[in-house]
From Swiss-Prot:
Residues 233-265 are annotated as: Disordered. Residues 247-265 have a biased composition (Low complexity). Keywords: Plasmid. This is Uncharacterized 28.3 kDa protein in PAR locus. It comes from the Bacteria.
Length: 265
């Protein structure tokens, strides 16, 4: 498994206003985001956290352009956890509809989860088909189900509010996406140094962001984060529609995904 120190650029953390435990990297130095000669300092608006920087990532990691209101496409190692805002109700329905109304494709995100950890009861259980649409969220602001995507004992503890949780295992092809409420999750662990290292492992986006995953590939993880930042529209709807995503496939050996195409403008 790749260690955090080997991939210092495998994260972007967007500021969550008013969240005391959020990781704020809006002022990160350009050399923290890749080679200094090819990267600009990451910028994020304080209110809406729209990233507008061009970033060159570490060796072996594909570069990605980050532009306001465009898709944010990153090639990331399969040790990444995604922490996002509420993806429930109408917003969650809009996320699923973003797969060009192909419901069989969209539910595959949840259907491939093998096990979830029932944090309240301290036991593992199967991921039922009636709950697969809830795989993307922990928005109840209390101890709830969590999924372990880290596969590293040094990073298998998160603190959900006041409840320290040991996260349970999932299937090998399920580790490309996890969305939880950003206000409920803070870094935790047996030693303080893990809290600093955890920042290399978590992608934090503010409430209202949309998180999608594309076609699975055997060697890399790529996530698509689509900003829900449209004037005159709600968080769960707009006149912008995504292009068709490639059909998903699963590899039993790795956690992976490729990027979807950008949103039509």
């Amino acid at each position: 498994m790749r260690k955090a120190g080997h991939c210092p650029a495998l994260f972007l953390l967007l500021r969550v206003p008013g969240r005391p435990h959020s990781f704020d990297l809006a002022r990160a130095a350009s050399d923290q985001l890749g080679r200094l000669g090819n990267a600009r300092s990451a910028g994020a608006k304080r209110d809406d956290a729209v990233v507008h920087a061009g970033v060159t990532f570490a060796a072996g990691v594909a570069a990605g352009g980050l532009r306001q209101l465009d898709t944010l496409t990153l090639t990331l190692a399969p040790i990444l956890v995604v922490v996002a805002g509420h993806l429930q109700g109408e917003l969650q329905k809009h996320v699923l509809d973003g797969f060009q109304n192909d419901f069989r494709h969209s539910v595959r995100l949840g259907g491939q989860l093998r096990q979830v950890h029932h944090a309240r009861h301290g036991q593992l259980g199967p991921f039922g088909p009636d709950r697969r649409n809830q795989a993307l969220g922990l928005g109840q602001r209390q101890a709830a189900d969590a999924v372990d995507l880290l596969r590293n004992d040094d990073f298998t503890r998160l603190q959900v509010r006041d409840h320290a949780q040991q996260l349970g295992p999932v299937g090998a092809c399920a580790g490309r996406l996890l969305a939880v409420d950003a206000g409920d999750v803070v870094p935790g662990g047996p030693r303080g140094r893990y809290k600093a290292l955890l920042a290399f492992k978590i992608l934090l986006v503010r409430t209202g962001a949309q998180v999608d995953a594309g076609d699975l590939q055997p060697s890399s993880l790529r996530l698509l984060l689509s900003r829900r930042h449209f004037h005159g529209s709600t968080a769960c709807g707009s006149d912008q529609r995504p292009t068709r995503l490639p059909r998903a496939s699963c590899s039993s050996r790795s956690i992976s995904g490729s990027a979807a195409r950008p949103w039509k403008r």
